[in-house]
Amino acid sequence: SSAASDVYKRQLYTMGKAILQLRQRGEPDGFLYSDEALFAKSIRRPMVAHFKPDYAPDYLLCCNYICHLAVFKKALWEQLGGERPECDGSQDHDLFLRLLEKTGGAAHVPQVLYYWRVHAGSTSGGADAKPYVAAAAKKALADHLTRTGRTGTVEDGLFPSTYRVKWDIVGEPKVSILIPNKDHTEDLEKCLHSIWTKTEWEHFEVI
């Protein structure tokens, strides 16, 4: 359709321009991603838009917030060997994690460049559409932790298609508790009392 054709042209132009700008500034240009939107019938009438943050590695451990549109160098794809069949269902999440192990980051293009049609069998329609997605995502995350030399257990998050890494605690690291407080003495006293009476961790400081 003409609408789809316009989207393709805008994708190519906007991403190409972003890559050139990154190169001019001397910044990495190996991996870029954009915002996206979901639609049911007409691409001109999106239901909801996903406006994403700039590169957030901790957030990516919780969910595949990058999703679409993603652009990366062909050489990186070939170096990684493409997608892994064992992560089918969450192959994009797995690929992004492996790409970022090489690039160290990704550039966010803050424009809606991808439009995803929602239907009953798609992952955009809800996590229940493909139950095996969660298992694949947890494998992708667990493998990523192993490759990056970190230890922890990947668990389901509070919401569908979200995950939590329960990190292994090595030794007794010091925990710094920052309490933003101004002219609220009673609230501060309650907070401090709660910390001192409920925590089981002894090595901490309150700032």
Give residue ranges: language-model regions:
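Catalytic donor-sugar/metal-binding loop of nucleotide-sugar-dependent glycosyltransferases
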Residues: 85-87, 97-115, 121, 139-157, ...
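Active-site beta-to-alpha loop of glycosyltransferases that engages the nucleotide-sugar donor
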Residues: 179-190, 201
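Cell-envelope/extracellular polymer assembly enzymes that use nucleotide-activated donors
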Residues: 94, 173-178, 205
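Short, small-residue-biased leader/transition segments that mark boundaries at the very start
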Residues: 1-8
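Conserved donor NDP-sugar-binding/catalytic core segment of glycosyltransferases
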Residues: 10-47, 119
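A recurrent flexible, glycine/aromatic-enriched loop bordering the glycosyltransferase active site
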Residues: 45-75, 87-88
